[in-house]
């Protein structure tokens, strides 16, 4: 689960991490009032969306007057911000975060992720702050310095000092960085995070380290023990179909293609999407109904696919290991009868009760196209989506 920048910074403050003073604004009046409360004569206005690349998209701007903040709010509040991390529709801007600015001497990067191979937390630090860390890793990997944290023992101050030396910090800056490093690691572990980023972490002209941006991604599997974090969830930033899918324990990710895919098993789902792409098609979604699919879940999955107006054909690829193909067939029939359908549906069933499943579909009087192999199914789906 993603958090907004202002939410992450509020949590940062609880862990005694240095952040700028800011005010959350939900309306133009809030923003105008905020600039009279915050110090200084220049403020950073930031659109709050669950996506990176806000600055390049115009969603972050320095404002120096009431007129400028009015212009910024009128431009973005209630609108959608499109960045390189969003789809073509962008994310809705319901909140603007207005905060005090500082004079910057240097921009650094500090982030943490889970290394699943070693089952440890890896911190990454770099002098290339303010940049896309993926680009830095690809083009200049020598600029990234790492420290590995055992979650059972936590971060050690000496690890923070070692990173500080590599970043070229000196004097009191090293002490500040070590404190920041240890506290971020504590936050990462205690809040069950999957990702943590401070980009940029700046060194001000006064020699103080400051978290100028903050990104937190919480492991959704751990939310049951963090109700205070669950309460921070912003449904407006999530795809409505993905939210509906979660209610039925369906793994759904919306894409921009025109061939709906319903598959059981994440690996098979990705393989199905690859085969569709190989034959010139464009998947409209990733949808894994899971190994314990019931008739009801399959029905909901089918309705979910058909709710996408861009879908011109549906490819159902089921391998019956745990799940029974006859249940899948009954779910498809139930969904089609309930929702109605006027697009081709290609079905490939293999495994447990596959013959029975095919028989159920054949006797349903529905317009379904049977496929014997995955390659044939993909080819039929691509042709159907093209109207051939």
UniProtKB/Swiss-Prot annotation:
InterPro entries, per the entry: ATP-grasp_succ-CoA_synth-type (IPR013650), ATP_grasp_subdomain_1 (IPR013815), Succ-CoA_synthase_bsu_CS (IPR017866), SUCC_ACL_C (IPR005811), Succ_CoA_ligase-like_bsu (IPR005809), Succinyl-CoA_synth-like (IPR016102)
Which GO terms are recorded in the biological process aspect for this UniProt protein?
succinyl-CoA metabolic process; tricarboxylic acid cycle
Q: Which Gene3D superfamilies match?
A: ATP-grasp fold, A domain, ATP-grasp fold, B domain, Succinyl-CoA synthetase domains
Q: What is this protein called?
A: Succinate--CoA ligase [ADP-forming] subunit beta
Cofactor or coenzyme needed: Mg(2+)
Q: Which UniProt keywords apply?
A: ATP-binding, Ligase, Magnesium, Metal-binding, Nucleotide-binding, Tricarboxylic acid cycle
Q: What is its EC number?
A: 6.2.1.5
The record's cofactor note says: Binds 1 Mg(2+) ion per subunit.
Q: What does this protein do?
A: Succinyl-CoA synthetase functions in the citric acid cycle (TCA), coupling the hydrolysis of succinyl-CoA to the synthesis of either ATP or GTP and thus represents the only step of substrate-level phosphorylation in the TCA. The beta subunit provides nucleotide specificity of the enzyme and binds the substrate succinate, while the binding sites for coenzyme A and phosphate are found in the alpha subunit.
What pathway does the UniProt record associate with this protein?
Answer: Carbohydrate metabolism; tricarboxylic acid cycle; succinate from succinyl-CoA (ligase route): step 1/1
GO MF term (any one) = magnesium ion binding
Q: How does it assemble?
A: Heterotetramer of two alpha and two beta subunits.
Q: In which organism is this protein found?
A: Actinobacillus pleuropneumoniae serotype 7 (strain AP76)
Q: Which family does it belong to?
A: Belongs to the succinate/malate CoA ligase beta subunit family.
Taxonomic path? Bacteria, Pseudomonadati, Pseudomonadota, Gammaproteobacteria, Pasteurellales
Q: Which residues bind ATP per the record?
A: 46, 53-55, 99, 102, 107
């Amino acid at each position: 689960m993603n958090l907004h920048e202002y939410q992450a910074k509020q949590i940062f403050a609880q862990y005694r991490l240095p952040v700028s003073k800011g005010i959350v604004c939900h309306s133009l009046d809030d923003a105008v009032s905020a600039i009279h409360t915050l110090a200084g004569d220049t403020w950073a206005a930031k659109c709050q969306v669950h996506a990176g690349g806000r600055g390049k998209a115009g969603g972050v701007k320095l404002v120096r007057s009431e007129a400028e903040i009015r212009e910024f709010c009128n431009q973005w509040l209630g609108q959608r911000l499109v960045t390189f991390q969003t789809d073509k529709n962008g994310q809705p801007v319901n909140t603007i975060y207005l905060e005090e600015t500082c004079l910057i001497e240097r921009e650094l990067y500090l982030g943490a992720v889970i290394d699943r191979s070693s089952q440890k937390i890896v911190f990454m630090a770099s002098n290339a702050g303010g940049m896309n860390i993926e680009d830095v890793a690809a083009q200049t990997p020598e600029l990234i310095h790492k420290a590995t944290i055992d979650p059972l023992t936590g971060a050690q101050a000496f690890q923070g000092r070692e990173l500080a030396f590599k970043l070229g910090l000196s004097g009191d800056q090293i002490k500040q960085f070590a404190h920041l490093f240890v506290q971020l690691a504590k936050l990462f572990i205690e809040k069950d995070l999957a990702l943590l980023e401070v980009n940029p972490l700046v060194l001000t002209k006064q020699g103080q380290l400051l978290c100028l941006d903050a990104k937190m991604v919480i492991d959704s599997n751990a939310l049951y023990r963090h109700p205070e974090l669950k309460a921070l969830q912003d449904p407006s930033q999530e795809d409505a179909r993905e939210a509906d899918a979660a209610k039925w324990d369906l793994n759904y990710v919306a894409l921009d293609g025109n061939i709906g895919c319903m598959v059981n098993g994440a690996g098979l789902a990705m393989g199905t999407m690859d085969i569709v792409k190989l034959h010139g098609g464009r998947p409209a979604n990733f949808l894994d109904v899971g190994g314990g699919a019931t008739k009801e879940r399959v029905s909901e999955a089918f309705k979910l696919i058909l709710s996408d107006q861009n879908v011109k054909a549906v490819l159902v690829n089921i391998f019956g290991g745990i799940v029974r193909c006859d249940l899948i067939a009954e779910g498809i029939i139930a969904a089609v009868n309930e929702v109605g359908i006027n697009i081709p549906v290609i079905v490939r069933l293999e495994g447990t009760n596959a013959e029975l499943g095919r028989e159920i579909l054949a006797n349903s009087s529905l317009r379904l196209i049977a496929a014997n192999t995955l390659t044939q199914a993909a080819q039929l789906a691509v042709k159907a989506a093209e109207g051939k």
